[in-house]
Amino acid sequence: MRHRKSGRQLNRSSTHLNSMLKNMACSLFTHEVIKTTLSKAKELRRIVEPIITLSKIDTVSRRRLVFSRIRDNAIVAKLFKKLGPCFFSRLGGYTRILKCGFRSGDKAPMAYIELVDRVKNNKKNEILKK
């Protein structure tokens, strides 16, 4: 029986699942929006939101905790300098999951996961207006 077991297995071993979720978290913090399957997005949200909560206040101990989960100095710096202060007044709900149809190959439900208060890049719109 599956009582009191949290999280999704996603048909992977535990080490593969942890590596995949860490890589997806790094991609989300780098690009601030990624497209993935709905179940992966829901599982990624469980990983990302506590990391953003830790990055609100910049201390050495919190940097070490975040670095132990992310393992990339550039992303940790971006979290504490840019994203953490941006979410300082927000108590939770840092990510948004938007459903975007089904994948053409196997009809898996797809979704965008994005950071809520991200700065949208308007350079493409400026070029199109000219």
UniProtKB/Swiss-Prot annotation:
PROSITE patterns: RIBOSOMAL_L17. GO terms for molecular function: structural constituent of ribosome. InterPro entries: Ribosomal_bL17, Ribosomal_bL17_CS, Ribosomal_bL17_sf. Signal peptide: none annotated. Pfam families: Ribosomal_L17. Keywords: Ribonucleoprotein, Ribosomal protein. The keyword Ribosomal protein applies. One of its GO terms (biological process) is translation. One of its GO terms (cellular component) is cytosolic large ribosomal subunit. Part of the 50S ribosomal subunit. Contacts protein L32. Belongs to the bacterial ribosomal protein bL17 family. This is Large ribosomal subunit protein bL17. It comes from Buchnera aphidicola subsp. Acyrthosiphon pisum (strain APS). The gene is rplQ.
